[in-house]
Amino acid sequence: LFLQKALGGFKVDNMMFYVLNDFSDDEIESIAEKIQSEKERYISVNKLYVAVSKTNNKLKSLPKTYQIVLRMLRLAVRTDMTPMFYDRLEVKKLILAVDDISLLESIYNENLKKLEVYDRDNGTDYMSFLRLYLKYDGSVQRVAQETFVHRNTINYQLAKIKKILGNNLKTFEERFKIILAFEVRDVL
C-alpha cells in the first residue's frame, strides 16, 4: 500500500530509500514499524535498520535530507536503535544538521579522542565509565551504586580521566564539551 503513494524509491549499495508523499507522521511510523517487524517475509538479513527523516516539503532539500538519513542509519547501526525517527533524536538533530564534518570531528578530537586512544592502547574502558559519570550528573555515589565499585576506585578512575583529557569536569562548560563530544561521536 505505501509503495503506491511513494513518489519514488532507489537503492544504494544495500540500502533502499523511499520518498513518500501525503503521509501523516502516524502513518510513516506505522509503515516503518511494519517494515521492521515483517522484514523476514521479504528479505533475508539478520538486521534491518530503518531511519525516518524529518518531514520535507521542498524538493530542493532532498539531497541534504538524504545525507542526514545516511548519518542516521550509521547511528542506528552503532546504537542498535531501529526504527529511528529524526524528530526523536533531541540533541543529535543539531549535530545531524551541521554540514561541516571537519568541525564536528574537531569537537570530538579536541575533547574526547585522547581518552578513546588511551582506552584502545591500554585495554581500559574509561569512555564508558565517563559517559556513565556524566549520565549521573557527576555523582560518584550513583556511579558506585550502578557499577558495584567502591567510591575510592571511582575517584581514582576519575582522576586518571581528568589527567588524560586535561579537563577537570567541574564546570558546566567543561562537562558540556565532553557531553557534546560524545553526542558527535555517536553521529559520526
What are these regions (language model features)?
Residues 1-188:
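Cytosolic nucleotide-utilizing catalytic cores of signal-transduction proteins
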